[in-house]
From Swiss-Prot:
Pfam families: Rota_VP4_MID, VP4_haemagglut, VP4_helical. Signal peptide: none annotated. Residues 483-510 form a coiled coil. Transmembrane segments: none annotated. Residues 388-408 are annotated as: Hydrophobic. It comes from the Viruses. This is Outer capsid protein VP4. Residues 65-223 are annotated as: Spike head. The lineage of its organism: Viruses, Riboviria, Orthornavirae, Duplornaviricota, Resentoviricetes. Keywords: Capsid protein, Coiled coil, Disulfide bond, Hemagglutinin, Host cell membrane, Host cytoplasm, Host cytoskeleton, Host endoplasmic reticulum, Host membrane, Host-virus interaction, Membrane, Outer capsid protein, Viral attachment to host cell, Viral penetration into host cytoplasm, Viral penetration via permeabilization of host membrane, Virion, Virus entry into host cell. Residues 509-775 are annotated as: Spike foot. One of its GO terms (biological process) is permeabilization of host organelle membrane involved in viral entry into host cell.
Length: 775
């Protein structure tokens, strides 16, 4: 059978030609390239007497909490919270646009009985009735819609932090109300937002709206301790507009020199542009189901001006800590479903590797005092239409996250041709409005950024900032920094593998099932498997050797090795003791059902939690003790052979990776069964178990004890036609006991007959198995 190729690889993968081994050692040999390092020659290490260095403050990064500023009158910018620190009772601030918006906030100290108080607001004397029976301060927001109307109390903030906030954003005025520490925001409409000015009577701070979570934290919990000392002196607001004169914002400073070495401090203002990459994979069948929507790394190259100099930059954006979501509209073939789609949220990170062609990146090996500051950016998702054949299309829409700088490290960035010493900027995430949903489904009001359309039509997202580092470089600029180990850049091979994977996956639609069954029954050896490649016999032999070396490290080969050791230990244990416990220990080497008698009698739910491991072990046992029926590995090997013959991109370098990947990834959803008399016990990788009678195909209770006994002594059979398909076939067409038994045993001749008769249920099942053969 076709799965013979896997057994041959398992058997032969531990022996390789001596010539190939020597060749491999030679290619992986490290080489030291050195120059005369002066007084450091004896240690071969970089100098350890570092200079103190200098790191200039950035002028491009907004602080989170800017202030305090002195009381003043001004027209606030949109998208900035004004955080006012009230220190006495009376009017805190007045704000108006002289058309449809007048508001004044007055502070009332704790424990005040109802009383009329006089306040001067907008140049008028007004009398407000106030009261406060709380232990906290109250801030009454008095509002009127025109100059002729009287003020009324629109909302109240009860606070022990004595902080008040106001924001211009989205055509509305936003303030806080409620009681700390659970105060929340609310808004008021206005037709003339731009003309709103504010008179502030206390010290205040300015916070960008991108840091609204921090503003919320300050309102409810108070300012950081450092802001509550007498050493913090409020400045005039005009200080924000001072133009700082600097000799050079992008500079290289020599810190120290020793022999051939010098320390250089590099300060750079940078503009980071990046984009998200994604992959959308649609399942086969009728066109209503999607396999996955996932993030993938994306490169972006661009130019920008820095101090009048044209800079060429390259970035790679990747994500970590994604959250897996799914949607299942039903079990019918025409029900829309997405098996997995990735979303980045607060627990995720975004990495952006940055490189440019400036001096700072030429000798980035020995680096210290690496620091950076970057602005935040909001990334908003767009729409993606799931183009189903019939009916209104579901649409994934929305979602947003804000990226906040969280650290910087050194990294290596791979392009199609070279590797680049880069800086990796790490960003933490906060979710933002709007939420995302899938229209025409039950998925609504979820937060995060899904991978369906993370760029929202934008060519890139942009972040500005600054970094500084001190690098140890040769004094003579013509020298290159010593490289301790030679590194082979395999990006070209990775690109070939990516193209080959895409080609392999697209070829699934072109495989004829009747030919596949015939091919699955052939005893494929390594020569016949690889002979479809246009090459000589010598090259085929060389490729087979390369495949065996790669296959030796595969999960399948590792599992076989572990299983052999485990069974040897169990056999020796059983020979020393005839107790039930020892026998069960032998059983559990195949099933992982139990370690002792009490565990064997566990419930059905207990075994379901272990079916993934059990199914893997059942695959190994079936491979070692193969029956006459067809196995999943026969189909897997036959599909692999077919795709190798049809491929135009397969070659000596890519074949080992493809064969190894196929053994691990082809047909991930498998079912295995054990046959005893007229009863069948079936288990699959999705955590489901079945027991049923051959004659009627009616389910019976799944006996864990019986399964544990049978799995040791009975042959394991691939459930090519699983129980659900058998049941469906019997209900719609009716099958005899002999046909049912042959399908249960995965008899290839019976399978071929059903396929030749164009039986839609059997054909659909085989098609689904072929479509699972993806890399």
């Amino acid at each position: 059978m076709a799965s013979l190729i896997y057994r041959q690889l398992l058997t032969n993968s531990y022996s390789v030609d001596l010539h190939d081994e020597i060749e491999q050692i030679g290619s992986e040999k490290t080489q030291n390239v050195t120059v005369n390092p002066g007084p450091f020659a004896q240690t071969r290490y970089a100098p350890v007497n570092w200079g103190h260095g200098e790191i200039n403050d950035s002028t491009t990064v907004e602080p989170i909490l800017d202030g305090p500023y002195q009381p003043t009158t001004f027209k606030p910018l949109t998208d900035y919270w004004i955080l006012i620190n009230s220190n006495t009772n009376g009017v805190v601030y007045e704000s108006t646009n002289n058309s449809d918006f007048w508001t004044a906030v007055v502070a009332v100290e704790p424990h005040v009985n109802p009383v009329d108080r006089q306040y001067t607001v907008f140049g008028e004397n007004k009398q407000f009735n106030v009261r406060n029976d709380s232990d906290k301060w109250k801030f009454l927001e008095m509002f009127r819609g025109s100059s002729q109307n009287e003020f009324y109390n629109r909302r109240t903030l009860t606070s022990d932090t004595k902080l008040v906030g106001i924001l211009k954003y989205g055509g509305r005025i936003w303030t806080f109300h409620g009681e700390t520490p659970r105060a929340t925001t609310d808004s008021s409409n206005t037709a003339n937002l731009n003309d709103i000015s504010i008179i502030i009577h206390s010290e205040f701070y300015i916070i960008p709206r991108s840091q609204e979570s921090k503003c919320n934290e300050y309102i409810n919990n108070g300012l950081p301790p450092i802001q509550n000392t007498r050493n913090v002196v409020p400045l005039s607001l005009s200080s924000r507009s001072i133009q700082y004169k600097r000799a050079q914002v992008n500079e290289d400073i020599t810190i120290s020199k020793t022999s051939l070495w010098k320390e250089m401090q590099c300060n750079r203002d940078i503009i980071i542009r990046f984009k998200f990459g994604n992959s959308i994979v649609k399942l086969g069948g009728l066109g209503y189901k999607w396999s996955e929507i996932s993030y993938k790394a994306a490169n972006y190259q661009y130019n920008y001006l820095r101090d009048g100099e044209q800079v060429t930059a390259h970035t790679t954006c990747s994500v970590n800590g994604v959250n897996n979501f799914s949607y299942n509209g039903g079990s019918l073939p025409t029900d829309f479903s997405v098996s997995r789609y990735e979303v980045i949220k607060e627990n995720s990170y975004v990495y952006v590797d940055y490189w440019d062609d400036s001096k700072a990146f030429r000798n980035m090996v020995y680096v210290r005092s690496l620091a950076a500051n970057l602005n935040s950016v909001k990334c908003t998702g767009g729409s993606y239409n799931f183009s189903i054949p019939v009916g209104a299309w579901p649409v994934m829409n929305g979602g947003a996250v804000s990226l906040h700088f969280a650290g910087v490290t050194l990294s290596t960035q791979f392009t199609d041709f070279v590797s680049l010493n880069s800086l990796r900027f790490r960003f933490s995430l906060t979710v933002d409005e709007p939420s995302f949903s899938i229209l025409r489904t039950r998925t609504v009001n979820l937060y995060g950024l899904p991978a369906a359309n993370p760029n929202n039509g934008n060519e890139y997202y942009e972040i500005s900032g600054r970094f500084s580092l001190i690098s140890l470089v040769p004094t003579n600029d013509d020298y290159q920094t010593p490289i301790m180990n030679s590194v082979t850049v395999r990006q070209d091979l990775e690109r070939q593998l990516t193209d080959l994977r895409e080609e392999f996956n697209s070829l699934s639609q072109e495989i004829a099932m009747s030919q596949l069954i015939d091919l699955a029954l052939l005893p494929l050896d390594m020569f016949s498997m690889f002979s479809g490649i246009k090459s000589t016999i010598d090259l085929t032999k060389s490729m087979a050797t390369s495949v065996m070396k790669k296959f030796r490290k595969s999960k399948l080969a590792t599992s076989i090795s572990e299983m052999t050791n485990s069974l040897s230990d169990a056999a020796s244990s059983a020979s020393r003791s005839v107790s039930i416990r020892s026998n069960i220990s032998t059983i559990s080497n195949w099933t992982n059902v139990s370690n002792d008698v009490s565990n064997v009698t566990n419930s059905l739910s207990d075994i379901s939690t272990q079916t993934s491991t059990i199914s893997k072990n059942l695959r190994l046992k079936e491979m070692i003790t193969q029956t006459e029926g067809m196995s999943f590995d026969d189909i897997s090997a036959a599909v692999l052979k077919t795709k190798i013959d049809m491929s135009t991109q397969i070659g000596k370098n890519t074949l080992p990776d493809i064969v190894t990947e196929a053994s691990e990834k082809f047909i991930p959803k498998r079912s295995y069964r054990i046959l005893k008399d007229d009863e069948v016990m079936e288990i699959n990788t999705e955590g489901k178990v079945f027991a049923y009678k051959i004659d009627t195909l009616n389910e019976v209770p799944f006996d864990v004890n019986k399964f544990a006994e049978l799995v040791t002594n009975s042959p394991v059979i691939s459930a090519i036609i699983d129980f659900k398909t058998l049941k469906n076939l019997n209900d719609n067409y009716g099958i005899t006991r002999i046909e049912a038994l042959n399908l249960i045993k995965s008899n290839p001749n019976v399978l071929r007959n059903f396929i030749n008769q164009n039986n839609p249920i059997i054909r659909n099942r085989i098609e689904q198995l072929i479509l699972q053969c993806k890399l």
